[in-house]
Design a protein with these regions (language model features):
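Extracellular and organelle-lumenal recognition/adhesion modules and their flexible linkers in secreted
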Residues: 1-225
Length: 225
C-alpha cells in the first residue's frame, strides 16, 4: 500500500529586526499602506529594539503621495528651484534625503500641488525633516492662491546648524522644532487652518528666503489632517 500526502507549498516568510543605534530617531520606522497612504510609527521598546512590546502610535493619513521622493514629477520647481538626491546621511541612516535649491527668488524652491485635498476651515499639520545647507533662512508653506497670509513657518539657520523660529514670517496655530539625532536634522512643522480652498493649493519648501539660490537638505514631507 502507498500512502500519499498532499504537500502544501508555503509562501516564503520575510523577517528582519531593528535595533536602535544611538539617538537617531524617536521611533524605529514608519509603515505606510499604499492604498490610502495611511501611516503609523513603530516605537522602540525599553531595550531599544522593535519587539512585541513596541507600541504603534499616531496612525494618520499623509496627504502627500510622494513624501520621500522630492524629485518625483509630483513636485515642481518654482523660480529655478530644484531637488537633487544627496549623498549625506538622512535622519534614518540611509541616503534618501534631497538637497533643495531656492533659485533666484525668496519664494523659490519646490512645491507639490494638493488642490482638492483640503477642506475649508479644517486644521492641517505640515512637517518635514530639514538640515542646514548653505542657506541661512528657510520657509515651508501650506499655500492657497486665493488666501493671504497662508499658514507658514520660517526658520533662521544659526551658524552651528540649529534652527530658530522667525516669528515675523510665521502664521500658524502652533509650531514645533524637534531635534532628531546628532547629525544636524530637525523635524520642523506647523499647524494651520485652511482658510480658503477656492484657488490652487500646494505645500512648498522654500530653502532660501534671501533669494540667493542657496540650499537646505530635506526629507520626509508629511501633511496630516
Amino acid at each position: 500500500n502507498v500512502s500519499v500526502k498532499e504537500a502544501i507549498k508555503q509562501a516564503p516568510v520575510a523577517a528582519f529586526s531593528l535595533r536602535k543605534l544611538g539617538d537617531v530617531s524617536p521611533y524605529a520606522c514608519r509603515i505606510r499602506r499604499s492604498s490610502d497612504n495611511t501611516e503609523a510609527q513603530v516605537m522602540f521598546d525599553a531595550s531599544d529594539r522593535v519587539s512585541e512590546q513596541s507600541t504603534v502610535r499616531n496612525t494618520s493619513q499623509n496627504l502627500i503621495d510622494f513624501s520621500e521622493q522630492l524629485d518625483n514629477s509630483a513636485w515642481s520647481g518654482n523660480q529655478g528651484g530644484t531637488a537633487t538626491l544627496s549623498a549625506i546621511t538622512d535622519p534614518f541612516g540611509g541616503t534618501n534625503s534631497y538637497e533643495v535649491s531656492g533659485g533666484s527668488q525668496t519664494y523659490g524652491g519646490i512645491y507639490d500641488t494638493i488642490t482638492g485635498l483640503l477642506t475649508e476651515g479644517k486644521s492641517y499639520t505640515y512637517s518635514l525633516y530639514l538640515k542646514k545647507g548653505t542657506s541661512t533662512k528657510s520657509r515651508i508653506v501650506l499655500y492657497d492662491s486665493d488666501n493671504d497670509p497662508d499658514p507658514r513657518m520660517t526658520v533662521i539657520w544659526n551658524s552651528d546648524g540649529v534652527p530658530s523660529l522667525d516669528s515675523s514670517d510665521t502664521h500658524a496655530i502652533a509650531t514645533k522644532i524637534e531635534k532628531i539625532g546628532d547629525d544636524g536634522w530637525y523635524r520642523i512643522g506647523f499647524t494651520g487652518v485652511a482658510l480658503n480652498t477656492s484657488g490652487v493649493q500646494s505645500v512648498t519648501i522654500e530653502p532660501d528666503r534671501n533669494g540667493t539660490g542657496k540650499t537646505v537638505y530635506a526629507f520626509g514631507a508629511m501633511l496630516e489632517e
